[in-house]
């Protein structure tokens, strides 16, 4: 299925983050770097998940955890091996894929806007990069799979 690898990678990123949090609890290190990274990441990921549809920039994500932009970048790299903006882009595309299937009456353009993309062509381009098909093809294939199953 197109995009399967992307979805698996996204799920693995979340799993790695949660394992990281479990590990830092086990070592009981008080005010360690792991504790602060975990807390910061949770704040920044929550912010992204609640505001992904808005026009976000690095400074807004960093402010969510009360840190500077450089520390935000370092924290993301340490914990999920991705930049905040790469994570945001993947999150937007993943949400768009879910919306395509959940809201068949919504146009690709409407969904692009709801996911924070400034144009449907930009959304389609990014979607293709992650899912190796257009949003319309993705919707059609998944509808066919649903009808066949």
Stretches found by the model and what they are:
Residues 1, 54, 104-106, 116:
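Flexible coil/turn residues that form the inter-helical turn or adjacent wing/linker of helix-turn-helix
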Residues 1-54, 59-65, 78-86, 90:
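Short, Lys/Arg-enriched, Trp-marked, Pro/Gly-tolerant hinge/linker segments that flank
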Residues 47-51, 55-94, 112-137, 141:
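Basic/polar phosphate-binding segments, predominantly the helix-turn-helix DNA-binding elements
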Residues 140-149:
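Generic C-terminal helix-cap and adjacent flexible tail
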